[in-house]
């Protein structure tokens, strides 16, 4: 029997910091208001000319290095993003593969907004367990600064740029494998989080540009309530399915959208603050990159170790949501 194992984690954090004080200069807001509402203190911004593939390639490079495998051993690249380098083609995954020097490798994108990394992990798991692939590089990469309206005080301060990546590999040892992944969606809530212009429904036009329809729009209050309810239910279902309790989880890594959401879900699940990884204060909401960036942060802080049981939980536009339960299983060399 072939299983999928989570072998390594890596991230790229752009060096440029945009603080709440910077937003005080461009919109009617304050550091106190942003911090109280979201828990965000600062976020990272990619350099001009940098694209999601540049961020993703840097994160991927680190993940490959930590997995202690050669680039030639990678046979699939999946990139989760909603800020691709190009609107239609080529895929960001293809560009990441090229920048990593990978040739003749299968590569494609996954679009599931903030749940994208969990979706990509699920696809990687399926490819490996089917025997079709042995080593998969999954990347969550976002340059949200490219799709923000910096006059919109309801959204512009929420998001940041960055990338995270992981190597998922085949193993015969069930004890070190990915235990389970759940991915769901409900398109009836499409209006809660969306970029209304630029696609085939509302193609690029003078109207789209003038009304900034190619920028992200979000109904914050409705999204908040639904996120807390959905994330809590999803985790409870996952734990009950495997006869686990919160005591069996070493690290809870939720999507980093808003500290109040993270806190509310943690309290509903009775998960201690010590087990919950929080980076939203440092990076803001980096969508598909937020979970791997948060895991990488905890790993570099020495908190995540081989054999730890980790639980991902994410919620995003679509709507999409999902959870993943797995053992962290770096290759022993």
UniProtKB/Swiss-Prot annotation:
* Swiss-Prot/TrEMBL catalytic activity: malonyl-[ACP] + acetyl-CoA + H(+) = 3-oxobutanoyl-[ACP] + CO2 + CoA
Q: Where does this one sit in the cell?
A: Cytoplasm
**Positions annotated as active site in the UniProt record:** 114, 255, 285
Looking at the record's lineage, which domain of life comes first?
Bacteria
Q: Which Gene3D superfamilies match?
A: 3.40.47.10
Show the segment(s) annotated as ACP-binding.
Answer: 256-260
GO term, biological process aspect, one? fatty acid biosynthetic process
Question: Listed GO cellular component terms?
Answer: cytoplasm
- What general EC class does the enzyme of this chain belong to? transferase
Fetch the SUPFAM superfamilies from UniProt.
Thiolase-like (SSF53901)
The record's PANTHER family line, in alphabetical order, gives: 3-OXOACYL-[ACYL-CARRIER-PROTEIN] SYNTHASE 3, BETA-KETOACYL-[ACYL-CARRIER-PROTEIN] SYNTHASE III
Domain characteristics, as noted in the entry: The last Arg residue of the ACP-binding site is essential for the weak association between ACP/AcpP and FabH.
- Please give the family membership noted in the entry: Belongs to the thiolase-like superfamily. FabH family.
> Which HAMAP family does the UniProt entry name for this protein?
FabH
Under the subunit heading, UniProt states: Homodimer.
Its name, as the record gives it, is Beta-ketoacyl-[acyl-carrier-protein] synthase III
Q: Which organism is it from?
A: Aliarcobacter butzleri (strain RM4018)
- What are the top taxonomic ranks of the organism? Bacteria, Pseudomonadati, Campylobacterota, Epsilonproteobacteria, Campylobacterales
